[in-house]
Amino acid sequence: MVASGGMATAGGAPGNGGAIAKAGASGTGGAINSSGGASPDGSIATGGVAAAGAGGSSSGDGATGGLRTGGATGSGGSTAIDVPIAKGGTSGTGGGGGSPNGGATSIACPAGAATGTPTTVSIDGANIKAANINGLTFKGFGVLSANGTSALLMDYKSQHPDKYAELLNVLFGGSHPLMTQVKIEMGNDRNNSTGPDPATMRLSTEVANVKRAPGFQLAADAKTFNPSLKVSILRWNAPGWVKTNDDVYTWYKNTILAAYRSYGYMIDFVNPGVNESAPDLTWTTQYAARIKADAAGFNSTTEQALYNGIKVVISDEVGIGSFGATMISDSTLRSSVSVAGYHYNTDDDSAGDFTKLAEQFDKEIWNSEAQATFSNTAFRPISGSGIGGTNSPLEMGNTIIKGFVNSHRTHFIYQPAIGSFYEGGQYSSKELLSARDPWSGWIHYDAGLVILRHFAWFATAGWENQANTLGVWRVVAQSSYTGATGTNPVSGRNGTPSYMTLAAPDKRNFSTIFMNDSATAQTYKLQATNMAYTGKPPLELWETRAAESGKAFNSNYMQYLCDVSADASGTYIVSVKPWSVLTATTLVNVGIAEYNTPLPIEGGRTVLDTDATGANQSTSDKVLYADDFEYSGTTVPVFGVGGRITGSEDFLTSRGGLQGAIPRYTCDRNGGFEVYLPSGSTNHVLRQQVDQSAMGLGGTWNSGNPITGVGDRRWLNYKASVDVSFENNSTQSGNNYAAIGARQQGGANSHTTSGTPYLLRLLFDGTWALLVDGASVAGGNVVSGTGGATIAGFKATYDTWHNLGLAVVDSKVTAYLDGTALTTYTDASPRLSGRVDLASGYYYTRFDNLKVETVDGSAPYYSEFLDDQETTDLASPPVTKLVYGGTWSHANGQDMYDYQRTLSKSSTAGASLKYTFTGTGLDILGPNDGSAKLEVTVDGQVTNASASTLASKEGYQTFTLRGLSNASHTVQVKVLGGTLVVDGVATVAAPIQ
């Protein structure tokens, strides 16, 4: 077992690929407290509940620790330059983190001389705008749940509540929560980028159901960790019945009240407009007036008062907001709108209107959809820029700084902050936290979260109250600057200064965050005047950067370095290393356990291989996965105050109820697939819930018919089957169909059936087709016998159940209907791994008894899957994994369909890649043109002097090696000619006997 934050014990070191052994699961089995340990009662300790509205400490100075008023702690008043790490190794558990001296006491920075010309940062208490309670208050960061990005999150809650609680605690818990808002982009069951979110009302007559939309439940659970959390909603596309603004108001109101009545919280902010569209300012003012005056349909005066107090946000446009000038000139609009938010771009309009709105009119300005990190930062240093570079955590940090400096953004919401959908979906690897394997409990916490801690942990973030008594810190414009170029992305590789200062409104404390996303060290002179403290308090220095070679990847994350003292003139000298972030603060945090506890380290990614129930991992039978959609007796935990588990709730009730509940492990890419209990029946089915003849269709980002995926991307050879039936008694000219697919990995066409390599489609009249990449390669009708297959007595009625099956073994694909083989297809360019898909037209369609089984004599799955940049694992000390020789480029920020957005590309002949593993084969995956010729060496012997490669798409195989004994092997491939692109390396498990 891998302890949270710890190194691996027997069974293998933790790594991104992960072994299949179930003992490789991360976690201690209990819930995680704020110090990283398991609480004996299974509860989550969060360090106390934040004061209402504050999102953090409510003390006057907002400090977690006390204020220092004297000189330096330790030996004298020396200044800090190029501060070394103290000897004695890292503290905390396993993989590092925490301060090098254990975090117990302060140490003085060693004396040093400044190098180069320092940049002066003046912090004048007169510039801390305590009277500005909205525009300059630092509100921290937010989670956007939208577009199917939370599709698997409730499975973590049901299957691994300890890991779900850990996730909530990391994001929303502690004395200084990172995330202060959950923003929910309401769905309409159609693809809005990654996938759809379920509509809360599919018909105007339907009672709003928020339990089937995971964002609402996420917000409810997050509030048990931070009751001050804000929640907002907006839409991109609406259900088919929503045609007018009155319909919008009805949909929103019913949904808002459903959330309040189901979970006990009122929505705080609403954007009445359309996501990433120009605002309708007339409707905005009308909506604001309606919501304030509405007195109908409430269950209590409290409910009405809370509803009437909802605030309005506009406009969530992509790029600079178009409405700044109107907000300045139109007092009616200005009084109607509390928040101006727009996406990604860090800049203001040409007149500086958003800066004026914040400073002169005290309006909140948000980056209401911001870019997080692209990649797994643990493996990023191979590219040569540490934790910085293209789409890195440091780049994200500079985006925060530039967003405030240029347009006074004081809140940043990440889309998505949580990536809880299968890899290969649109906008994959764009998140701060990845939770894609609910059966294993695997979660990757990226170093981007540590960057956010450098801001949120050294201030009191949140929303100030009207009485201005909560002590929320202000951002100090005159003490913040960046020379980083660009708007999205932002680049600080030019080595120019970049910093942001946060300060307590009572002027007793401040923190300055320095971001250095460059190869050049930077030196700063801090000078503080007109502050409310006495003397010249030392500044604690906290740093994050990549590890030195041979050290645990996170050994330099959130490290307390030392206390720097002011010189006789009151000046502090601070040096910021290349590719690092450093926070200098008057707060005393060094002795606080929370600050010396690293993020949890991901454990092994156990392959999905269950018993016949689908609920329990088991490698002792022929079943890889099964689901009859009953879930009888299954419950999920209920979280109470402080994240404590206070009870349980029926599985289906918690996820939407009998007429539409979130199934286990499915990830929709179009349409709405839910567990459904037909009237008069006791048999639950999986039903595609969007029927265009009954409800029409709303708008969409990526058009396509309903399709959902389930399973593990590492599955290789298997037979998948499912029962299907229809509710519409017309074939609808071939559009009313049911289908099963195999070996789906995602990609640009994944929102349609053409993105599934192999798919069997059936009409109820017996017409079938085997599709490869969306094109028919075989077909016929089992009633007439066309196509070569006849099934005697086949019942060609719409409501009869039939069984669809696909067997995929190496390059062969065999289609089955009711157990009869229809055809076998051999693919010259086989796709060898991937999940199972279920698909239909936009008509009510039923599925049941899904089963995925192993195939005798064939390997069922990869035993390990590594990112191309995974040259070491995550243990302490790290163990060597992939070994590159010769000349390669290792690039980050690649295509969204590349695994973790990284690629390694050979530059010249002679480039080599070597890996030692246990298994029967090795594959290289990634987008290739098939030009590479490889010399293959196994255990020191050349086994193929000139192996060919295949042209391949993202997620699929360009080179395969099979037939090895199930033992330890060292395989090397050397490029003889052409170009080899490596996205992933996978090892093959033993065949099923």
Feature map (PLM): residue ranges:
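Carbohydrate-binding surface patches
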Residues: 471-537, 579, 911-913, 920-922, ...
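C-terminal beta-sandwich/jelly-roll accessory domains of carbohydrate-active enzymes
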Residues: 514-637, 965-970
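N-terminal catalytic cores of secreted or lumenal carbohydrate-active enzymes
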Residues: 113-272, 281-289
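Secretory/extracellular carbohydrate-interaction modules
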Residues: 688-771
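Ser/Thr-rich, Pro/Gly/Ala-heavy low-complexity intrinsically disordered linkers and tails
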Residues: 1-115
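Extracellular glycan-recognition surfaces and repeat-rich motifs
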Residues: 635-694, 875-898
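Glycan-recognition surfaces in beta-rich domains, encompassing non-catalytic CBMs
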Residues: 505, 579, 816, 841-993
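Aromatic/acidic polysaccharide-binding cleft in carbohydrate-active enzymes
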Residues: 367-484
